[in-house]
């Protein structure tokens, strides 16, 4: 029992202590709240606390505030007549405000000022009459005296006017800062736009500025520079200085750039297949052969080096180049020696069909004009300024060989070089077996300058069987 009593006493003491602490905390909060309201509003006339264990703040309207101020002044008055007069004035002001609110609700927004002025005049006239009868000042006289003497109106109104002036100054200051910030942003934008417009013409001018050739007297070579040029091995003049000779004109340059694509456009599919066939060592027959692909490449490279030393090429020099190539090929043929009789007699025979007669022996090919026309075209020679390209040297060996027609075609010329000894004149190419085939080399690779030691090939027939 004693323990229970002790516990009850302790809990009661703790409750008292907690209540004291809570009340003191609420008082401190109330003081802070009132300080904030006074700092904002200037006075605590509109603030009112509710009654109860936990008081709550409540703000009164401004009209009630005026009544409260009159009550405060009436309390200060020493005689009861002033207290009654203050109450009567508060009632009059309340009635007047209610009447004005009713009039404003009934009338429109456009007639608010016109409708409120007569009512105010009537109320002022009634107040004047009453003041004359009672000998007391009216509301307007009190308002005028309050404006003239701010100290009589109380310290709250004076503080509110000063704070209002400060707020107006702060507002104007903020407006000026915002205006300055906007102007700074606009000026920065204009500067960036101007900077971009000044840079763009310089870039375009540098990109489209034509390059000038010193050899052509300042003539612009913009067109030639914009076109895709040949690779580095076809342009040995790139490493030269501008003072060295060897600049070709624009037409030569364009033809050199087009010479890259020349073998692809010139060689037909038949020629390509024929060249691949003759490149294959399994298709080679014993006997005299034309220079190989590597020999043509070496000759083309040597000619390219000679031509790149600065000489411009004309039509006559092109013909001289072709004759030089032909002479070299003839020398190589002579070095290898003419085809002996034993080699000719040991040529592999074609498989013959017993039902087909051999009525078309191989005859000589007298078409020198065709070879004279074909050589300049296959070597890439034209009447304009043309340079010998290394790529043409690679493909030149392929183009000099005449290809075998496909199986489905019937040859139109009986004296063609491609015919085999075993083909028939009436059956065509269909019954012939596919045998590796080597065409006879051309009799003459010249341009009409003269016969150069290859006449022993002309007029001789190819022997297909063994000697005996």
Swiss-Prot record:
Among InterPro entries, the record links this protein to: IQCC
Q: Which residues form the IQ domain?
A: 6-35
* Superkingdom field: Eukaryota
Compositionally biased tracts (Basic and acidic residues): 139-150, 415-426
Region described as Disordered: spans on this chain = 113-157, 202-245, 329-468
PANTHER family referenced in this protein's UniProt entry, alphabetically: IQ DOMAIN-CONTAINING PROTEIN C
Q: Per its record, how is this protein called by name?
A: IQ domain-containing protein C
Species this protein is from:
Bos taurus (Bovine)
Identify the taxonomic lineage of the organism of origin. Answer: Eukaryota, Metazoa, Chordata, Craniata, Vertebrata
């Amino acid at each position: 029992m004693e323990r229970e009593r002790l516990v009850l006493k302790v809990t009661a003491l703790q409750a008292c202590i907690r209540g004291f602490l809570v009340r003191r905390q609420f008082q401190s909060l109330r003081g802070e709240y009132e300080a904030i309201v006074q700092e904002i509003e200037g006075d605590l006339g509109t603030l009112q606390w509710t009654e109860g264990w936990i008081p709550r703040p409540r703000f009164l309207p401004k009209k009630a505030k005026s009544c409260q101020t009159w009550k405060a002044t009436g309390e200060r008055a020493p005689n009861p007549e002033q207290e009654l007069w203050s109450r009567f004035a508060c009632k009059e002001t309340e009635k007047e405000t209610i009447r004005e609110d009713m009039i404003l609700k009934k009338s429109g927004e456009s007639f608010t000022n016109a409708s409120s002025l007569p009512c105010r005049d009537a109320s002022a006239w009634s107040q004047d009459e009453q003041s004359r009868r009672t000998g007391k000042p009216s509301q307007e006289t009190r308002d005028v005296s309050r404006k003239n003497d701010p100290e009589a109106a109380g310290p709250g109104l004076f503080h509110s006017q000063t704070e209002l002036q400060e707020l107006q100054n702060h507002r104007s200051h903020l407006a000026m800062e915002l205006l300055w910030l906007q102007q700074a942003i606009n000026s920065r934008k204009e500067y960036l736009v101007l900077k971009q417009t000044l840079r763009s013409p310089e870039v375009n001018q540098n990109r489209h500025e034509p390059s000038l050739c010193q050899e052509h007297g300042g003539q612009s070579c913009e067109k030639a520079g914009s076109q895709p040029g040949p690779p580095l091995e076809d342009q040995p003049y790139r490493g030269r200085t501008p003072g060295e000779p060897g600049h070709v004109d624009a037409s030569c340059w364009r033809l050199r750039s087009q010479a890259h694509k020349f073998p692809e456009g010139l060689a037909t599919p038949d020629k390509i297949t024929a060249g691949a066939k003759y490149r294959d060592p399994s298709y080679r027959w014993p006997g005299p052969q034309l220079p190989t692909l590597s020999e043509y490449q070496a000759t083309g490279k040597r000619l390219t080096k000679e031509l790149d030393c600065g000489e411009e090429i004309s039509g006559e020099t092109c013909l001289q180049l072709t004759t030089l190539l032909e002479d070299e090929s003839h020398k190589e043929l002579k070095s290898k020696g003419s085809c002996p009789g034993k080699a000719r007699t040991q040529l592999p025979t074609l498989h013959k069909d017993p039902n087909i007669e051999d009525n078309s022996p191989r005859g000589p090919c007298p078409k020198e004009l065709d070879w004279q026309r074909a050589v300049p075209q296959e070597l890439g020679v034209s009447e304009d300024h043309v340079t010998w390209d290394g790529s043409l040297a690679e493909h030149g060996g392929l183009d000099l060989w005449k290809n075998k027609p496909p199986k489905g075609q019937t040859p139109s010329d009986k004296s063609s070089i491609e015919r085999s000894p075993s083909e028939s004149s009436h059956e065509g190419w269909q019954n012939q077996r596919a045998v590796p085939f080597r065409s006879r080399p051309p009799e003459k690779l010249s341009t009409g300058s003269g016969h150069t030691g290859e006449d022993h090939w002309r007029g001789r027939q190819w022997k297909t069987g063994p000697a005996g």
